[in-house]
Structure formats: structure tokens, C-alpha cells
Amino acid sequence: MSSLSSFLPASSSAGRSAAASAPLSRRGLFAAGTVGLASLTSLAVAAPASAQGETWTEAFMTREETREGFEIGAMDQWQVENAQFIIAVCKGHGLEEAVTTVTLITAIVESWLYNYEPAVDLDSGGLFQQRPSMGWGSAADVRHKKKAIDAFLGLGEISSAPGLLQAVPDVASWEPGQAAQTVQASAHPERYAEQVTSARTIMDRYSRKVAPFTA
């Protein structure tokens, strides 16, 4: 089993490129492909009950999540909740499924679908590893799930960076991975396309069960 350190980044002068010895995402979080089931199981601990069907609380939105690893067949409760919340927020905005798919693949690649707390690439954090220094809001904003999702979509008031709906106004006509790359400007753009199937599987599992979140 790979050690946890093998998934962590080495900083670059640009703050975006990953260590040459480990194929990581733009902000150094996601190893190529998916993390093995054994690795994921060893890292996951008991998770709280699902928030689905309940109020999405402020505690949920700001929960510090430092777990690592993603396997579509072994998502833990936090990953399920976060995926459901992304779907709920996109539904609440009345957005098409293509937008939700791009949002999900970006969160899978950037943070393993966790509200990742530690700053990995200089000042990055949260579901999308957004950087305050790049106009995505404050350090607290990028670690607040609703604010981070809205900022990624380009619908929040806390971000000056162009979000998905500004950068790719005709999302449905784009290849999902390319749409994600247009927002994220990754040093490893191929990573997004690799997670399209996972995002669509998540949509198939949960979309019909999740109510729109409009708060």
C-alpha cells in the first residue's frame, strides 16, 4: 500500500505544478487514477450520519475534512454527503446536469470530494482547492462548501475569479473535462476527463434522491 506521503505535493515556484516523482493534480492532491480500496479503507474513520433529508447545517458546510483518497465503489459518508450537497446546490440554482457533472469531477480531482482543510498549494483549500490569492474569496470562504460551490459556478459574491458559467457559458456543448480545465487551469488537464464516469455514476446514484438547496 502506498504511504500517505506519496499523495502529498511538493511546492513549485508557480504554485501549480506537482512533484515530478508523483503524478498529482494541479494543487497536488489527487494521485493519477483512483486510490486503491485498501488505501481508502485504511484512511477512512467513522463518519457522521448522512445529512440527506435533513437541514444542511453550517457545521456541515464548514466541517474540516482531512481524509484522502477516492474510490467510486467505496465512497465514505463524508464523500457521499459532499456529492449530494453539490447536486443539491446545482439543483437549487436550476442548473443542467452537465454543470453538475463538471462540478463533481472537479471536486473529485481537486480534493477527493472532501472539504480539505490544510493549505496544500500555497494557500489553497476546500472542495475545489481554490486559492484566496487568486481571487476565490478568503481562506474561510474557500473552506465553506456552499460558498466554494457558488464560487466555482460563478454565482457567488465572494469571488472575483471567473467561474464555470462565465468561462464556459455553453457547458453542455463541451467535453466535461475540458470545461473543468477551463476554470481550473490545471497542469494536468487530463485528470478531469478521467473522472467523468465517476461523476456520472454519482449522478445516477443520488440525483433523483436529492432535493434542491436554495438557502
Identify the meaning behind each predicted range:
Residues 43-58:
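C-terminal segment of N-terminal export signals and the immediately downstream linker at the start
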Residues 80-87, 100-103, 146-153, 177-180, ...:
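Extracytoplasmic/secreted envelope proteins and their assembly/folding machinery
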Residues 1-24, 33-42, 49:
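N-terminal secretory signal peptides
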Residues 90-97, 107-117, 152-160, 187-191, ...:
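Sec/Tat-exported extracytoplasmic proteins
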Residues 214:
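Active-site lining segments of carbohydrate-active enzymes
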Residues 171-211:
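A charged, solvent-exposed segment within the mature domains of Sec-exported extracytoplasmic proteins
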Residues 58, 63-108, 112, 209:
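Export/targeting segments at the very N-terminus of extracytoplasmic proteins
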Residues 57, 65-78, 111-176, 180-185:
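Peptidoglycan-targeting cell-wall enzymes and recognition modules
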